[in-house]
Amino acid sequence: MLQQSAAVDVIAAGKAAGVMLNAFAMSTDIPLRRMLGIGPSRPAALPDGAEWAEGGHPLPTEGSVAAARRALEMAQASGADDLLVVLLSGGGSALMAFPASGVTLADKQQTARTLMEQSADIHELNTVRKHLSTIKGGQLAIAARGTVLTLAVSDVVGDDLSVIASGPTVADDSTYMDALAILNARGGEAAFPRAVVERLRRGTAGEVPETPASGDVRLQRAIARVIGPQRGAITGAEVAARSLGYHVHVVREPVTGEARESAVAHVRRVASEAGTLPRPFCVISSGETTVTVRGRGRGGRNQEFTLAMAGVLAELGENVAAASIGTDGIDGPTDAAGAIVDSTTLQRAHDARLAADDFLKDNNTYAFFERLDDLIKTGPTATNVGDLQVILAG
């Protein structure tokens, strides 16, 4: 495909954009005409001649809009015999954002913030995003005249290409009606900007074109593959745990749902099976939970998941530790990837006069773990394959 193309352009968008762009450029001897990377921060090194655009995350910024405009310009400039390679990774939805006509950046920011605070999952969030965008939901691909090849690293449970980075180069079978229903289920229309509600209503009435759906002829030259599945982190964790002498049990079902509720259910499920697991054991799982924000504190879904685990960890006995982290190194609006708890956490909290339940109710898990020095801080990892949970028992 590369050899048969008149010219090759590359767009990389997401938290792994720098790594993916560098790796792709190094993997081919074919000259790359134009290269654009879109990420949260400029990497230390880029291929010669590559452009870099910095966007915002978890909410889009003016930089995100400028980046999306540049990506759309590159797609529109490609010829019928050219190849556009699109390298996608988690975070691409916010990092590359081009509001649809009548919708402002502020409208999109408020909408995304409200949906996240109302515990919308990534499928719901990105369904709405796609219907407020000029680039998401296959629209980047139909702007290109030539072939579009998408290679994606997934942060989405199930590796749905239409959800990863809001699927800018693949068919979108969600509708304006779906998006409007999500708003009504997550706070009601009054909780969202008027321009957003009006656009979704107009789309539902057929006054605004839908995103290109499966079978759309405009996508017949668009090819997409997942090259890094969401469960990829489990493989690395399993190898590491075995090398340390643990008997490893991998949970096949993804961990999803409200963080604090899923955490309790997860620990109790492990506890019910603990008698059949040889010790020391390591239970590994992955997925992506959500948080309904009711308090005024600071934290993220992994910190909330971890603190909720602490309350029931005793059911696994002594000498137990558990952690949940975001593989991108960023959990919510904090500088931590997640946190760790063990059999001593609640006693240490009590000794420090910290009421775990109060911190959980206020969504203030960062402050709780900071006081106990139990935050996990990796810094940005330049990738994103969802969240990883580990339970260790000696």
Predicted regions and their residues:
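Internal helix-turn-beta structural module
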Residues: 306-394
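Glycine-rich oxoanion-binding loops at beta->alpha junctions
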Residues: 38-80, 123-124, 128-129
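A glycine- and small-aliphatic-rich helix-loop capping segment at beta-alpha/alpha-beta transitions
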Residues: 23-31, 50-52, 76, 99-110, ...
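Gly/Ser/Thr-rich active-site loops/lids in small-molecule metabolic enzymes
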Residues: 103-120, 172-187, 295-322
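A glycine/threonine-rich phosphate-anchoring loop and its flanking beta-alpha core
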Residues: 122-188, 200-201
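Accessory alpha-helical/coil subdomains and C-terminal extensions
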Residues: 144, 149, 171-265, 269-272
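Active-site segments that bind and position negatively charged phosphate/pyrophosphate groups
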Residues: 231-235, 239-324
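An N-terminal, well-structured beta->alpha segment
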Residues: 1-11, 19-23, 27
